[in-house]
């Protein structure tokens, strides 16, 4: 080992040459060689992040948990090295060029001035695009689910990853693979949907895209976070092991095994009294031993310290560090509150085995080695300049994803005898509502605008985001559009109603844009920490819509939200009331947009004017009431409405629902008669565009296990395909289905496929069923309390029966999980 004069008399270990020539740092296993040369302090330093800018509120209890400033320089703080830099671009607004220059210089300093010369890994949030100033904002993940288009999401992930890698960022804290169960939870907009297969296929596509650009994806939140009690953030999770295995785990299995995800983040929650951050059965036994994961597990921000201050299972930070490290958390984020001095003291006193530290450090070093951080030339090039984080490619992809995510929920005839949408040429339009002219309303909780920039109100967004009003003016001309806000998103002030009503009455059509404001921890109506007890639209927005409808002007309600709301009044009216003049409560049309991002306003204008046809489908059920939650369409027979309860959990609109400007029919379903329990079967259907306009359909293949050894869902999405057809055109869609799609966890807690009959059919949504088709018989009827229910539009084939033959098949990780499909 070569020493330098600067370290000879410091009492510290001699400094290694920065090119890693010693010890064997250019050999086949540089990580192992570096680990062998490390002091305990240097090891601990690799297991933590350092947060340079702890301003604003972007993490739970950030103010309480933030380390006190100690006056030391960054060089002194990182004298032993550092594992990660926390959000150097994403904590406050910084010019990308300036920050890149700083980062390159800082990485070179780490290489030259620390003994081991190891650069820091840089992580950033990237759920709706890189969460940095002037970076493109894509639709929120709930919109990814609504698009039912994994290939497009993969392209979006690749574009996000390219921006991050250009800036010297190595790890992205996305995607969220939590399965939605309760729309009252504030973090629903970060999720993809309520179906594990949809979450898994779309989430895996994002992982592939991000990692193809050289950025490690981080799967979160492992495991069961979205099942928190009553939709309350961080609340205890009370789900059984079978539900964990069959609902919450499959998306992670897909993203790990099929997507090759390289990092995982723990859930904040506790399951059956054990916080996940201290649960070795999950983080090591399940994740590593059973699933074969060999990447890094990073702590959700402050979750190691939360073992002490929130969960109360650790006496102090050192105790928390010991619990988390033993459970399997390799890296403490965002800072080293527990894994630095408290952990080092525990190791030196013999209370923690140093081999646990070595295990985590080796994983970190191997990640850095794979990402090129141990290469001699790392950060020796010039930092990027003229950085553009919102290129034409970003905007094109953002618009495509936004357009495919918009869900048309209703579109009734107006007195002229035609549906109100698309708007007729030459119509004057009133654009009304609290979200009609606010760029923030188009963006999700983890967008930079709502996550960080809300704490810097004097700064601009940094790039163009046309609002719905601005996009309508662009589409129709200034003279054709009138506008009024009417009210705010929250509060009870109705002073603006009169202006809104006047503008609507003077127009041919009114477009009322309502919904949410995303934010964190009380700053907004949805987002992290913004859970709700009610699923009514916030504030007086419903009253605003009703006041506009009462003018008699045909009214389109556009929802810009991060969760599904209980809007049965807008879709079905009260007790059978129809749309029309005379004070009816029901708008002529309703469009659901889950925070559609920077091109969302333009995509909405295109849909309203007919420049694009709606093709999004609901990734979550639209709830009837808050009291019916939690809910999922994936329920067994007694999980739905029945004659043994007066409560009706039937959603207002089901999973997979969505209308267009044309209609589709499904014909000639053919399905293999039998399949071995470890095999594949084919299902083919003709899809016909029966309307007068071109359009895209999401063809949904559903199934039902008729008799299982445990209760099974009445309806289960098996696979899906997006198909574009001209008016009158038809095509054949073939699904190739691994019978593993019917797998479940049996009474012995094995994941199996059992022999017996299963039903298979194609439908336009989860509740669509052909009249006279095969349905369960006897005893199960919706009571509904006598409420009038309008039928939900939809079409379906009859159900075909497939016999699964052979012995019980115990599913392995090598079994196929994904349905293949082809068109033509």
Report the location of each language-model feature:
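Terminal connector regions
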Residues: 738-815, 820
């Amino acid at each position: 080992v070569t020493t330098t004069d600067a370290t000879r008399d410091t009492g510290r270990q001699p400094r290694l040459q920065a090119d890693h020539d010693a010890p064997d740092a250019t050999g086949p296993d540089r990580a192992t060689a570096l680990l062998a040369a490390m002091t305990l302090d240097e090891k601990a330093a690799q297991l933590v992040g350092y947060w340079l800018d702890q301003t604003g509120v972007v993490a739970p209890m950030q103010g309480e948990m933030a380390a006190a400033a100690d006056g030391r320089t960054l060089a002194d703080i990182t004298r032993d090295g550092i594992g990660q830099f926390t959000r150097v671009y994403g904590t406050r607004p910084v010019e990308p060029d300036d920050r890149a220059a700083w980062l390159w210089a800082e990485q070179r300093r780490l290489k030259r001035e620390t003994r081991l010369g190891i650069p820091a890994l840089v992580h950033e949030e990237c759920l709706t695009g890189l969460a940095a100033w002037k970076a493109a904002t894509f639709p929120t993940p709930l919109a990814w689910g609504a698009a039912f288009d994994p290939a497009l999401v993969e392209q979006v992930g690749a574009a996000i990853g390219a921006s991050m890698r250009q800036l010297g960022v190595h790890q992205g804290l996305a995607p969220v693979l939590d399965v939605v169960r309760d729309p009252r939870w504030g973090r629903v907009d970060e999720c993809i949907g309520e179906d594990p297969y949809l979450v898994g296929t779309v989430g895996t596509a994002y992982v592939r895209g991000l990692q193809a650009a050289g950025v490690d994806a981080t799967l979160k939140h492992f495991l069961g976070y979205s099942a928190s009690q009553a939709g309350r953030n961080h609340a205890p999770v009370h789900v059984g092991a079978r539900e964990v295995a069959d609902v919450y785990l499959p998306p992670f299995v897909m993203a790990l095994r099929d997507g090759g995800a390289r990092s995982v983040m723990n859930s904040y929650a506790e399951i059956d009294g054990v916080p996940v951050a201290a649960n070795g059965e999950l983080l090591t036994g399940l994740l590593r031993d059973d699933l074969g994961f060999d990447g890094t597990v990073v702590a959700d921000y402050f979750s190691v310290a939360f073992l002490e201050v929130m969960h109360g299972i650790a006496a102090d930070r050192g105790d928390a560090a010991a619990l988390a490290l033993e459970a399997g958390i390799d890296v403490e984020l965002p800072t080293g509150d527990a894994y630095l001095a408290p952990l080092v003291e525990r190791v030196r006193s013999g209370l923690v085995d140093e081999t646990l530290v070595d295990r985590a450090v080796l994983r970190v070093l191997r990640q850095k080695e794979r990402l090129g951080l141990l290469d001699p030339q790392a950060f020796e090039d010039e930092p990027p300049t003229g950085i553009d984080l919102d290129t034409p490619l970003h905007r094109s992809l953002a618009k495509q994803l936004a357009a495919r995510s918009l869900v048309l929920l209703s579109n009734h005839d107006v007195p002229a005898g035609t549906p109100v949408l698309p708007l007729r040429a030459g119509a004057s339009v009133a654009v009304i509502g609290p979200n009609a002219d606010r760029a923030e309303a188009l963006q999700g909780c983890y967008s930079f605008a709502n996550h960080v920039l809300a704490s810097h109100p004097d700064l601009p967004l940094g790039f163009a985001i046309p609002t719905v009003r601005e996009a309508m003016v662009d589409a129709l001309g200034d003279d054709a559009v009138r506008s009024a806000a009417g009210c705010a998103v929250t509060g009870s002030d109705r002073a603006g109603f009169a202006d809104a009503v006047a503008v609507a009455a003077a127009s041919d059509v009114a477009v009322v844009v309502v919904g949410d404001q995303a934010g964190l921890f009380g700053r907004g109506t949805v987002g992290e920490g913004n859970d709700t007890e009610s699923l009514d639209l916030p504030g007086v927005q419903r009253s605003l819509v009703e006041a506009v409808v009462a003018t008699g002007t045909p009214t389109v309600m556009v929802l810009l939200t991060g969760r599904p709301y209980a809007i049965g009044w807008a879709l079905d009216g009260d007790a059978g009331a129809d749309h029309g003049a005379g004070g009816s409560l029901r708008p002529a049309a309703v469009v659901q947009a889950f925070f559609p991002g920077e091109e969302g306003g333009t995509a909405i204008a295109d849909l309203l004017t007919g420049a694009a046809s709606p093709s999004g489908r609901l990734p979550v059920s639209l709830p009837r009431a808050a009291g019916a939650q939690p809910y999922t369409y994936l329920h067994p027979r007694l999980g739905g409405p029945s004659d043994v309860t007066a409560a009706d959990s039937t959603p207002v609109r089901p999973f997979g629902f969505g209308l267009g400007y044309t209609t589709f029919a499904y014909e000639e379903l053919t399905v293999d008669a039998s399949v071995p329990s470890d095999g594949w079967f084919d299902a083919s259907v003709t899809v016909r565009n029966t309307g007068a306009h071109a359009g895209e359909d999401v063809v949904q293949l559903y199934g039902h296990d008729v008799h299982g050894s445990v209760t099974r869902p009445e309806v289960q999405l098996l696979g899906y395909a997006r198909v574009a057809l001209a008016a009158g055109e038809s095509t054949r869609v073939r699904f190739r289905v691994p019978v593993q799609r019917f797998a479940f966890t049996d009474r012995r807690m094995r994941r199996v496929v059992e022999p017996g009959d299963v039903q298979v059919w194609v439908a336009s949504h989860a509740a669509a069923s052909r009249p006279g088709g095969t349905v369960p018989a006897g005893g199960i009827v919706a009571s509904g309390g006598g409420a009038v229910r309008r039928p939900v539009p939809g079409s379906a084939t009859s159900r075909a029966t497939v016999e699964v033959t052979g012995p019980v098949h115990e599913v392995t990780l090598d079994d196929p999980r994904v349905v293949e499909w082809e068109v033509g």
